[in-house]
């Protein structure tokens, strides 16, 4: 295979670990903190096998993109590095790792950037995460031409998919699906007031309160959908309070009563809400079992703040988990995490075919670009060789024509350069076209294609009689050269022939 992502004998090697291949606990342990990414990327290239590295670390995947000149030794080094930084044993990791090489690695990054490989299909956050991963690796100095080109193509592909298809609605579908499931566990608040009693069926959350933890895309979708379901009040908690306040402002503009609190204010809010939606993407639990038990106790068992008894629903849309798994064991609490929701959603997914068509189109374009670039070093070497031959011929000319005027000499040099440029221009262009196409051709066909020889020209010089004459002339030239013992005179014969 003429791998498009190959540079000389090197190819892109991807080793990954994601929600599809590994349990949550392993993903959480393998996650690399932002502060450690530069050190890890440098460790990946600290050998003779790998020349480039980029680590993509998100809430539900760890992917290690490298450029390796040998597959097996490159793979061993990447796996050993993952084990070193995660503290996991190689034997523990290997069953859960996936590997892509050359063109397959390029295709995978394009799919990831498009949201096609995400737990929530179509989520846009991955584009920013990939951009940040590239910037980190670039600043560390571990990104070269190959990973630069691949990442830029992936970012372009992701933007096209989100602007040209309806895949974004898939993320909204997951949030709405999660809240639809939550409605199964929340008792209608019909007896609270005349206003609630008259609330339309389309607003089943009238009289209820919600807490949203996080202020990203998923949190924003949750706020919007809660408003449509008639929620009375939304509290938004986030590490950066200004982002929480921005989301609150959007909610208020949509007619939803809302307020913002810092992330450390979450525990104080738990007892006053019926629904919790968490989507921070943080490493480590934001809400613990102890927090929830205290909140349930403060609310009088499973009684809500409004005085009615019902289930407190906690929706965890993060990976790694924001909400401690053992919360599910608390009476009166229903925990819905992203893994469970994905399984329950089943076929409720957006049509991915338009997005996949864009990925295929961008991949093909990228492969052609990379194949065309792969011939550049050879073209440069060819031009360098031609320059050396021309220089030798000019030196020989100077020895043979010491009386030639400077004007004539300059004219000869200019003429020779023109001849070399004209001879090499067509094969340079054709070589890039042939490489981009990726088709296999015979040596004679390749030579004819490189020099763009007209159809029939090769046949015309190999007609019966002409071929014999050509062969005889070639043999004669070789014989004359063989008869000249001096190496210095060989060049003269070639010049005179």
UniProtKB/Swiss-Prot annotation:
During catalysis, the active site Cys acts as a nucleophile attacking the alpha-carbonyl group of tRNA-bound glutamate with the formation of a thioester intermediate between enzyme and glutamate, and the concomitant release of tRNA(Glu). The thioester intermediate is finally reduced by direct hydride transfer from NADPH, to form the product GSA. It catalyses: (S)-4-amino-5-oxopentanoate + tRNA(Glu) + NADP(+) = L-glutamyl-tRNA(Glu) + NADPH + H(+). Residues 461-486 are annotated as: Disordered. This is Glutamyl-tRNA reductase. NADP(+) binds at residues 214-219. It comes from Corynebacterium jeikeium (strain K411). It comes from the Bacteria. Belongs to the glutamyl-tRNA reductase family. Pathway: Porphyrin-containing compound metabolism; protoporphyrin-IX biosynthesis; 5-aminolevulinate from L-glutamyl-tRNA(Glu): step 1/2.
